[in-house]
Amino acid sequence: MWGGRFDEGIDARMARFNNSFPFDQRMWREDIRGSMAWARQLAQAGVISTEERDTLLTGLETVFAEFANDRFEARPTDEDIHTAIERRLGELVGAVAGKLHTGRSRNDQVATDVRLWTMGAIQRIDDGVRALQQALLTQAEAAGDALMPGYTHLQRAQPVLLAHWLLSHFWSAQRDRERLTDCAKRTSVLPLGSGAIAGTPLAIDRAALAADLGMAAISPNSIDAVSDRDFVAEFLFCAALIGIHLSRLAEDMIIYSSAEFGFVVLADAYSTGSSLMPQKKNPDSFELLRGKAGRLTGDLVTVLTVLKGIPSAYDKDLQEDKEPLFDAADTLELALPVAAGAVATARFRHDRMRAALDDAMLATDAADYLVARGVPFREAHHVVGRLVREAEQRGVALSALPLDILLAAHPACGSDILQVFDMDRSAAQRRVPGATAPGSVREQIIRARQCLGEH
């Protein structure tokens, strides 16, 4: 393909080092699609005849079928997926195969392949995130008005609806999908026609070429088109953040499924046992989901580091973009169905959650009670803090303090202060949009259904 100016063959060690076919062969669909579109444009531009175009297309269809049916036979000399397909095409149709690469460089060819592959990966991962959202929403709808402790710093904070907590993970997943949508816009840009660096001299209709390949736009600059993989980095950032969100959900589920909490029981199908301890039921599904976040972050850092040091235009360093790209997509395509399944089959223990609520979580409500009677919040905060300390010293719940102690805490306190020690009342008071009151949560559920295209 490129050996004409060389007097010696490539060293076997260098050939192995240079060879990307073992991993980039998975882009065979995209490479053949791009080559078929390019053949049509070569004929449209008068560079090849319609007969030659049809011969090339027929040959490429045969190569496609060989890959699709796992019958493609690679050769040791196949440097990458592009050379492998071109070599096989030559075996099938003869010398006319040599015309396919007219006006095209592997630089714009591979950039196109990677963009097409990434577009497909974005759609598959979006489907996976949506399935997780559906599982979260279904559980939220089933939870009704069940209360659970809300935690900050992993300390009991305020009562919230179980559905409210479930939906918190729904909305982070929704932003993940929005980021994927944005990433798709910048990925769906056609580099083909950019050549090696300066653009093709042929009268190629790049807009028609983009439409043929299902891409939304054409690249405005040939140097940028062949050299930048910012769309890969952006995709990997989206993937890494999805991993982080999966990790946070997993951490919650791991904690809540422990015997110390007992808020959730994981299905056997998403748990494992111990080789030694017969009683163990381990949340391995969520532990693995938590662990994958580090891998996804590593894929992002790999590509950012590759991109950092290279000058303008194409450099061989860019071959290193594919393995982290493929790894991140593979990881999420494996992880997301597990996450959705583990959430969908989990059984939430409303009784255990209710039992974990304690009066100290209503301290803010007591402060709000004083604020409603004209006490500045900072003063009210201090007053209730003293009451909490008094309850701790007596070893009783906040609501179990003698009424005279409560009344003596501040002149604004009346006997009706006892009304604040009601968990359901506490949640119901938080009625602003996005809050945990049952009505507000029902509004969230309606919005969530709309996000999923439901009514």
UniProtKB/Swiss-Prot annotation:
Origin: domain of life: Bacteria
Pathway: Amino-acid biosynthesis; L-arginine biosynthesis; L-arginine from L-ornithine and carbamoyl phosphate: step 3/3
Pfam families: ASL_C2, Lyase_1
Principal cellular location given in the protein's record: cytoplasm
Protein's UniProt keywords contain Oxidoreductase: no
Broad EC category: lyase
BP GO terms, sorted: arginine biosynthetic process via ornithine; L-arginine biosynthetic process
Reactions performed catalytically: 2-(N(omega)-L-arginino)succinate = fumarate + L-arginine
Keywords on record: Amino-acid biosynthesis, Arginine biosynthesis, Cytoplasm, Lyase
GO cellular component: cytosol
InterPro entries: Arg_succ_lyase_C, Argininosuccinate_lyase, Fumarase/histidase_N, Fumarate_lyase_CS, Fumarate_lyase_fam, Fumarate_lyase_N, L-Aspartase-like
Subcellular location: Cytoplasm
EC number: 4.3.2.1
GO molecular function, one term: argininosuccinate lyase activity
Entry's family note: Belongs to the lyase 1 family. Argininosuccinate lyase subfamily.
NCBIfam families named among the record's database cross-references: argH
PANTHER family named among the record's database cross-references: ARGININOSUCCINATE LYASE
Name used for this protein in its record: Argininosuccinate lyase
Protein's organism: Roseiflexus castenholzii (strain DSM 13941 / HLO8)
Primary gene name: argH
